Amino acid sequence: MTRLFGTDGVRGLAGRDLTAGLTLELAIAAAEVLPERGIPGKRPRAVVGRDPRASGEFLEAAVVAGLASAGVDVIRLGVLPTPAVAFLTGELDADFGVMLSASHNPAPDNGIKFFARGGHKLSDEVEDEIERRLGRAVAGATGRDVGRVTDDTDSVERYITHLVNSLPNRLDGLKVVVDCANGAAAGIAPEALRRAGADVIAIGDKPDGFNINEGCGSTNLDALRAAVLEHGADAGIAHDGDADRCQAVAADGSVVDGDQIMAVLALELYEANALHNNTLVVTVMSNLGLKLAMKEAGITLVETQVGDRYVLEAMRAGSYSLGGEQSGHIILLDHATTGDGLLTGMHLLAAVNRRGVALAELAKVMNRLPQVLVNVSGVDKTRVATSERIAAEVAAAEAELGDSGRVLLRPSGTEPIVRVMVEATSQDRAQAIADRLADVVRDELSINA
């Protein structure tokens, strides 16, 4: 049986895959599992937030109904970024948090993820326990034992204050464009940047429930690049639908991705003696150029499988303060318990302002090797690891590249695709090898074969 939880909670087409009924059952099962890891004898409490997708309204109602019927007090936070829900799980002393979002996915999709006490993502083992209890857990609270439901009207203010107070220096004098992806960051990211002193131009800041991530945000930087150039801004910051990731655009229109952002922040923390154990945690998808730059700076690199949850697990295990993914999920563990796009963007801008150097120049701390990523759809991703032909082709490509590049082929944890990533000394060489491997994957794993 396929595992219900992916690398970032449960996702699917809202109303078909992620139904009100399934969401209700997940909430009831979570209410049975998560308070067991809370404080004995204390009435369970949960916070619930969502991004602005229209389907979030009925899914929120299902979550609240499930939790309250299981005897959990519920604090509705409204529309907030995922990291804000994680922060408020701890800030409001909740036993757990619930976020409804499908992150960078299109508007018809939605998802549900849980945070444990303190705002940390759940381990695979805890998610498996919730999944095992689906349909078995009983919402048996009656009378005075049913959960009460309240709204926290200060949630946005609490989060913005937290962001601004985390900065090592202000952003006065910087002109910044922020793309809110018509998502949860709308109205929050611009205000946080303004309070930190920046001159802000906001785009993608008019969510209507159906336009989230549509032609905007961290997975589509064209609008941000155009706005940065049009307004003569010092930098642009882009978030995804739930604002747990960040990508940047420099004044010259060049893209500064998650690897480059991590390189800048790692050196900032290193110089301030705040990079715990002089270590940066990344995933196997990070560019080889980042690894070489950190080695030259004397910073140790710890590598994990793809998924910010695995980055976080390694960070907590080793007491490290910085880690993340090339996609822009970056964790500043001294200030947050999970990837926070707003926090990341503001700390990047603080580094730009403190050094008085253009972002494009600052990003040159690492030399990014040409990288090609091909997403192969219409294939059975579950057979990747068992295909001898694919393994042989990958080995041949690795031998061809030697020390001047690398190959990574893996199934997506959140989508029905296989990702083929190749790095090489030239874009053409990387593209040719990636295309060749993608053709093998299609031929070998095609669902229609």
From Swiss-Prot:
Entry cofactor note text?
Binds 1 Mg(2+) ion per subunit.
Q: Which cofactor does it need?
A: Mg(2+)
The record's section on SUPFAM superfamilies has: Phosphoglucomutase, C-terminal domain, Phosphoglucomutase, first 3 domains
EC category: isomerase
Residues at the active site: S103
EC assignment: the record states: 5.4.2.10
Q: Which family does it belong to?
A: Belongs to the phosphohexose mutase family.
Can you name this protein? Phosphoglucosamine mutase
